[in-house]
């Protein structure tokens, strides 16, 4: 079997693709893969480290206002379609899977015109412009949230989940917290503002930790940008560990009791696979406010609390955290509700979808 995967720009498009690739390798080790990304996307750093054959296209996104930039965007898109067709004819994949980002638009569209079976994976509750465009041309649409179903043709769509979930679903608590100077036996709150950090979250966490004196622990990944600043402001405390970044995030999540962070699709897939209660702070800077919709899918099922970015400060953060961390019954209820929202066999579902499409 030969599978071409395309998607990029952000980790939310890349990690689900890589998780699926890793799963297929366990099922069919002889499968050949190729990844096609954008020249300037994050995938340029991440994918080559996997050893997978990797090709890039020169492509960029649209701006909301009319501009010369958009004329160039159209030119690059048409050029990318031509380049994608060359790659596809050379590699001859049995199926092409797009996970979002502008590059997947060109590659999946090109594949559809060459009559190669195609699947797109939508990670969010509200689809992006690329997957909306591609939905008219692809054979199958894999959804991560039921809330995304109304945006796509029902006859093409299946609830699959996010393949990243299956990678973390079977993880148990480990001793990893000890590597951050914390007690693996104590209840722990993990606070994470995204790989780059988030100013509003950093300000609220700084206020919250200034007078922290609780029995539970806090592990905060601030992002490199804010690390030195918060280190100078927050007094040393045995129950608090501040790190610029956490490499083994999934393992740390599995060893935590509460997650505080943004409502990106990958984070939600991971925390629901683990049954981890959460306080979600949707980013106000994303397209179509999709993180709020992602968060609400858990809030309405009592699996998470939500604090709007403009309502976040040290006081609101402390109140939300202590409401959960001081109430064992609530914590257990939220954990169960979170687990019920998860799809821990997402990669298997995607694999079965791919096989059914190829054998059709």
UniProtKB/Swiss-Prot annotation:
This protein's pathway: Cell wall biogenesis; peptidoglycan biosynthesis
A Gene Ontology MF term for this entry?
undecaprenyldiphospho-muramoylpentapeptide beta-N-acetylglucosaminyltransferase activity
Biological role stated in the UniProt entry: Cell wall formation. Catalyzes the transfer of a GlcNAc subunit on undecaprenyl-pyrophosphoryl-MurNAc-pentapeptide (lipid intermediate I) to form undecaprenyl-pyrophosphoryl-MurNAc-(pentapeptide)GlcNAc (lipid intermediate II).
Write down the chemical reaction(s) this protein catalyses.
Answer: Mur2Ac(oyl-L-Ala-gamma-D-Glu-L-Lys-D-Ala-D-Ala)-di-trans,octa-cis-undecaprenyl diphosphate + UDP-N-acetyl-alpha-D-glucosamine = beta-D-GlcNAc-(1->4)-Mur2Ac(oyl-L-Ala-gamma-D-Glu-L-Lys-D-Ala-D-Ala)-di-trans,octa-cis-undecaprenyl diphosphate + UDP + H(+)
EC category: transferase
Where is this protein chiefly located? membrane
Cite the InterPro entries for this sequence.
Answer: GlcNAc_MurG, Glyco_trans_28_C, GlycoTrans_28_N
Organism field: Enterococcus hirae
Query: Could you state one GO biological process linked to this protein?
Result: cell division
- Keyword tags: Cell cycle, Cell division, Cell membrane, Cell shape, Cell wall biogenesis/degradation, Glycosyltransferase, Membrane, Peptidoglycan synthesis, Transferase
State its location(s): Cell membrane
Which Pfam families does this entry report, sorted A to Z? Glyco_tran_28_C, Glyco_transf_28
Please provide, in alphabetical order, the Gene Ontology terms of the cellular component aspect for this entry. Answer: plasma membrane
> What's the Enzyme Commission number for this chain?
2.4.1.227
This chain belongs to the protein called UDP-N-acetylglucosamine--N-acetylmuramyl-(pentapeptide) pyrophosphoryl-undecaprenol N-acetylglucosamine transferase
How the protein sits in the membrane? Peripheral membrane protein
User: Domain of life, per the record?
Assistant: Bacteria
Q: Name the CDD domains for this protein.
A: GT28_MurG
In which family does this protein belong, per the annotation? Belongs to the glycosyltransferase 28 family. MurG subfamily.
């Amino acid at each position: 079997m030969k599978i071409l995967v395309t998607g990029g720009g952000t980790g939310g498009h890349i990690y689900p693709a890589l998780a699926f690739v890793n799963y297929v390798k366990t099922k069919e080790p002889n499968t050949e893969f190729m990844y096609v990304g954008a020249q300037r996307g994050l995938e340029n750093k991440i994918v080559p480290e996997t050893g997978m054959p990797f090709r890039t296209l020169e492509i960029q996104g649209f701006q909301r206002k009319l501009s010369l930039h958009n004329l160039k965007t159209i030119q690059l898109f048409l050029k990318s379609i031509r380049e994608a067709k060359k790659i596809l004819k050379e590699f001859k994949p049995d199926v092409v899977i797009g996970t979002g980002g502008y590059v997947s638009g060109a590659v999946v569209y090109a594949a559809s015109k060459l009559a190669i079976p195609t699947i797109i994976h939508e990670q969010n509750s509200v689809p992006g412009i690329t997957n909306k465009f591609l939905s008219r041309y692809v054979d199958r649409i894999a959804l991560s949230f039921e809330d995304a179903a109304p945006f796509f043709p029902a006859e093409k769509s299946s609830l699959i989940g996010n393949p990243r979930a299956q990678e973390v679903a079977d993880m148990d608590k480990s001793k990893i917290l000890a590597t951050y100077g914390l007690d693996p036996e104590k209840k722990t709150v993990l606070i994470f503002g995204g790989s780059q950090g988030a100013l509003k979250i950093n300000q609220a966490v700084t206020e919250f930790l200034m007078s922290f004196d609780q029995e539970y622990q806090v592990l905060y990944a601030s992002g490199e940008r804010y690390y030195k600043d918060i280190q100078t402001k927050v007094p040393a405390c045995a129950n608090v560990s501040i790190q610029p970044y956490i490499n083994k995030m999934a393992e740390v999540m599995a060893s935590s009791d509460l997650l505080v962070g943004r409502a990106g699709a990958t984070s939600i897939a991971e925390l629901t696979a683990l049954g981890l209660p959460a306080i979600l702070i949707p980013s106000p800077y994303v397209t179509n406010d999709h993180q709020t919709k992602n968060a609400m899918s858990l809030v309405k099922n009592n699996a998470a609390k939500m604090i709007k970015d403009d309502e976040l400060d040290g006081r609101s953060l402390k109140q939300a955290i202590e409401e959960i961390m001081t109430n064992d019954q609530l914590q257990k209820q939220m954990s169960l509700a979170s687990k019920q929202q998860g799809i821990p066999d997402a990669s298997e579902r995607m694999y079965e979808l791919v096989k059914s499409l190829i054998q059709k």
